[in-house]
């Protein structure tokens, strides 16, 4: 999901900026989901790892895109893994901060 400028500014005020290098894992599937993420710079890959270790690509996200929507559900766990394609800067917002 891509967000408008007003929501983008709100995210910047409420969240925490984090930096990741190429190939860093931002989060793994089955991690507890308690925050939304917004891409500020760079690109991230969203994918699922099957039981036999195969990776199924779901999406590539860039600036202005939100991911981690599974955190909107109480006691949710991440259904996907997200990793940095290149150097990435994101904002993370815990649900209670939104």
Positions of predicted regions on the chain:
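Short phosphate-coordinating micro-motif centered on Lys-Gly-acidic
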Residues: 26-31
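A short beta-strand-loop-beta hairpin characteristic of the jelly-roll/cupin
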Residues: 44-57
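Short loop/turn microsegments at loop-to-beta-strand junctions
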Residues: 15, 33-34
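Glycine- and acidic-residue-biased ligand/ion/polar-headgroup-sensing regions
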Residues: 34-47, 63-65
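Cyclic nucleotide-binding regulatory module and flanking cytosolic helices
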Residues: 1-25, 61, 66-67, 71-72
């Amino acid at each position: 999901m891509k967000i408008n400028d007003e929501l983008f500014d709100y995210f910047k005020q409420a969240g925490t900026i984090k930096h990741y290098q190429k190939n860093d894992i931002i989060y793994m599937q089955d991690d507890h989901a308690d925050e939304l993420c917004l891409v500020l710079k760079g690109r991230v890959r969203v994918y699922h790892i099957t039981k036999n270790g195969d990776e199924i690509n779901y999406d590539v996200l860039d600036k202005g895109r939100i991911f981690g929507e599974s955190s909107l559900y109480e006691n949710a766990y991440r259904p996907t893994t997200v990793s940095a394609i290149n150097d990435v800067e994101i904002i993370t917002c815990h649900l209670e901060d939104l």
